[in-house]
Amino acid sequence: MNIISVGVNHKTAPIEIRERISLSEVQNKEFITGLISSGLAHEAMVVSTCNRTELYVVPAIYEVNGEFLKEYLISFKDARKEVRPEHFFSRFYCGTARHIFEVASAIDSLVLGEGQILGQVKNAYRIAAETQCAGILITRLCHTAFSVAKKVKTKTKIMEGAVSVSYAAVELAQKIFSNLSMKKVLLVGAGETGELAAKHMFQKNARNIVITNRTLSKAETLAEELGTNKVLPFETFREHLHEFDIIITAISTKEYVLNEAEMHQSMIKRRLKPVIILDLGLPRNVDPDVSKLQNMFLKDIDALKHIIDKNLEKRSRELPKVNAIIEEELIAFGQWINTLKVRPTIVDLQSKFIEIKEKELERYRYKVSEEELQRMEHLTDRILKKILHHPIKMLKAPIDTTDSIPSRVNLVRNVFDLEEPNQSH
């Protein structure tokens, strides 16, 4: 009845080890189906992302423990030269449940509250379910984890506030202008940072986005993705600066892309209508003296990182609330696990009494009418329900320090003379 979690993540191993041990979707399917078909596991699932590769396994035999699974994965990836068992963590029983609840609720992420991980856990479960590798335990474990994540998102602020430079820039623009749908945006640079900023802008309802890049085709590709199809040649974009309410720069350069003189002329043409410049470049893309101009709001990476740090601090203050939700769900999950342990005894107990009832009724089958026999059957059913109520309730009750599930099971089986159940997961 054990659930083992074994894996590497950003806390236990450097990126080169995480890259070496990660599994593609094809490898994921091959790995978990191999565990099942070889008789090593009843159930298996793998969560594999850039920051973690984690196995969740219900062993089929005693020999399948944490150390076995570490070696099994290392061997599967042919990574014995690079990867060592000490790069792994191991969790068991409720420790496994706690871990996946923390992962799904984004408090085990590299960036606290980063919500992308929930989708990755859901994808891992989808793969396990589609390959018939997710049985009753992993299915319940995952659905409880999804429920935990939903409660954490709705009842805490752990995922609120920008914690990336590009998203912080967009949030700042929204705070200043409120309605971005009415604003015209210029993106200078179509690299990874610029692309993220543009997509965040689009999510905040900014639709009038114009893109310029040294390589025009790259700007055109991003514009097509956003559905704007609005680009400017890099050589001439400065002629249009006055048209924009928000300017985002994210380009690799040793010289300033925008200087004070250019922006001064732009502001004259704009009749001093406010402009936000979000400088996401490193080195900086915009001359700091631009901030001296009237109605010109310039924010660079350092200013945005200050916002990010404050948001991370706010998220950290939500951790006690998140942990309280996890603890509550852990108790419920543990109680459910306990019901699985007592289920065979409950079934055997009910079966024995039903068998006794049917034998006794059979003795009267030809001595009474069919109508009377049915009344007797209904009566004995009610009696059996009342007789079995207390022992079943006792088996299902939460455990405390004075007893255990095995002791309860043994007591009931001895009192009612039940045969030992067949061992299965």
Swiss-Prot record:
EC numbers on record: 1.2.1.70
Gene label: hemA
Active site annotation, chain numbering: 50
Amino acids binding substrate: 49-52, 109, 114-116, 120
Annotated protein name in UniProt: Glutamyl-tRNA reductase
Keywords assigned: Chlorophyll biosynthesis, NADP, Oxidoreductase, Porphyrin biosynthesis
A UniProt-annotated Pfam family: Shikimate_DH
GO molecular function list: glutamyl-tRNA reductase activity; NADP binding
Pathway of action: Porphyrin-containing compound metabolism; protoporphyrin-IX biosynthesis; 5-aminolevulinate from L-glutamyl-tRNA(Glu): step 1/2; Porphyrin-containing compound metabolism; chlorophyll biosynthesis
Task performed by this protein: Catalyzes the NADPH-dependent reduction of glutamyl-tRNA(Glu) to glutamate 1-semialdehyde (GSA).
Classification via Gene3D superfamilies: Glutamyl-tRNA reductase, N-terminal domain, NAD(P)-binding Rossmann-like Domain
